[in-house]
């Protein structure tokens, strides 16, 4: 893959100079959805899918960015003196946002760059193509400009900051953290309030993790994602009038139920309930996994989906069909929506001897009920 992209880079930008290659993975979140901006826990793992960059410094301050995924857009040019978001900049707003954040934090970019990007994460799939691109840009800049003091955790934080403040999506830290800190065959149990984390092996002896792409795209910026965050922040302020808490993640289920009437809106109550209960589900799920209790892990995944569908209201008809189909198949241990919502992917844990039947049945029945194919084959098994 890298050799082909380097060759494409040379044809596009010329063969001379110090040409370097980089990669940052996407992620799938096993459980802990919409908890990362509510002070809760998450449990993502990095994927082999991700984003590649081939890059070279320039002698001037020009930026020439090209995506092999959007060939018709050609090379998009700007400069280090023009790091402002714009509709015309399209996908380049993500790397430009990271560059802007580097400069803002005192990491001076002294040269322009030629960059070729290629990603094999489907856009809008909920597998964090934008976070992967942000972390990729951070890793590239750290190496190209020898910012050796920067840690991978700081690169994740830079990615989140740029998406919040340059791209206008009020996301939490999970996606960038999973991309920056991902480790083969492990998920990351992350406390988003403290950034304390531990790796947990997810090599399952008798089951596989299967990702199904609904092929329904979403844009977190244009969707109700920011609304959900605002609703949770308002609910937190209402609860803080009666409780000494810093985040919704500080609460147990019992504490929430005893004090939920402080939240003045039924909708905000539902949003806060999801944040509290999902955080506790995530803690219990990791405990179950450590105890090799995959059945309990699956039940918690199922409960997570119900909460995301009914309380947080970030699912959609196509995703619910995929999950309902999964639940109906013998050998499926658990299934839920993954990612920000409003489309994207489901993640399921499926017993080894049921994987082929799962792929065949879900694929055929989804197409019959929805009218288009889901992205689902042996490559969906991670």
Predicted regions and their residues:
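Gly/Ser-rich oxyanion-binding loop with an adjacent helix/lid
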Residues: 1-22, 28-32, 38-41, 80, ...
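N-terminal cofactor/phosphate-binding cores enriched in small/glycine residues
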Residues: 32-34, 46-47
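FabD-like malonyl-/acyl-CoA
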Residues: 132, 345-349
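A short, compositionally biased micro-patch
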Residues: 46-48, 58, 120, 183
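C-terminal nucleotide
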Residues: 1-27, 52-88, 186-334, 349-382
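Short Gly/aromatic-enriched secondary-structure transition segments
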Residues: 39-46, 228-229
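Glycine-rich phosphate-binding loop
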Residues: 342
């Amino acid at each position: 893959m890298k050799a082909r992209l380097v060759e494409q880079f040379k044809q596009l930008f010329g063969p001379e100079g110090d040409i370097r290659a980089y990669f940052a993975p996407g992620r799938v979140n096993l459980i802990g959805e919409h908890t990362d901006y509510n002070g809760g826990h998450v449990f993502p793992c990095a994927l082999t899918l991700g984003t590649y960059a081939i890059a070279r410094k320039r002698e001037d301050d020009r930026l020439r960015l090209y995506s092999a995924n959007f060939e018709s857009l050609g090379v998009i040019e700007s400069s280090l003196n023009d790091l402002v978001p714009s509709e015309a900049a399209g996908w380049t707003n993500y790397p430009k946002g990271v560059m802007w954040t580097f400069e803002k934090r005192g990491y001076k970019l002294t040269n322009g760059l030629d960059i070729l990007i290629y990603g094999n994460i489907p856009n809008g799939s909920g597998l964090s193509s934008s976070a992967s691109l942000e972390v990729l840009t951070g890793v590239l800049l750290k190496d190209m400009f020898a910012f050796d003091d920067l840690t991978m955790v700081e690169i994740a934080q830079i990615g989140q900051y740029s998406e919040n403040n340059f791209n206008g999506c009020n996301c939490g830290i999970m996606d960038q953290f999973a991309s920056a800190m991902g480790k083969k065959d492990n998920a990351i149990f992350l406390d988003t309030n403290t950034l304390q984390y531990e790796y947990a092996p997810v090599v399952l002896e008798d089951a596989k993790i299967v990702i199904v792409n609904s092929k329904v795209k979403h844009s977190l910026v244009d969707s109700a994602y920011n609304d959900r965050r605002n609703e949770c922040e308002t609910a937190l302020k209402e609860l803080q009038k009666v409780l000494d808490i810093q985040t919704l993640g500080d609460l147990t289920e019992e504490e929430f139920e005893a004090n939920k009437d402080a939240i003045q809106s039924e909708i905000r109550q539902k949003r806060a309930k999801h944040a509290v209960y999902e955080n506790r589900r995530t803690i219990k799920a990791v405990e179950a996994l450590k105890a090799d209790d995959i059945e309990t892990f699956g039940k918690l995944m199922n409960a997570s989906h119900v909460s995301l569908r009914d309380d947080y209201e970030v699912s959609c008809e196509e995703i619910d069909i995929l999950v309902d189909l999964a639940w109906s198949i013998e050998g499926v241990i658990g299934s839920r929506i993954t990612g920000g919502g409003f489309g994207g992917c489901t993640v399921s844990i499926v017993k080894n001897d049921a994987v082929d039947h799962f792929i065949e049945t879900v694929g055929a029945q989804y197409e019959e009920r929805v009218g288009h194919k889901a992205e689902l084959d042996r490559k969906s098994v991670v």
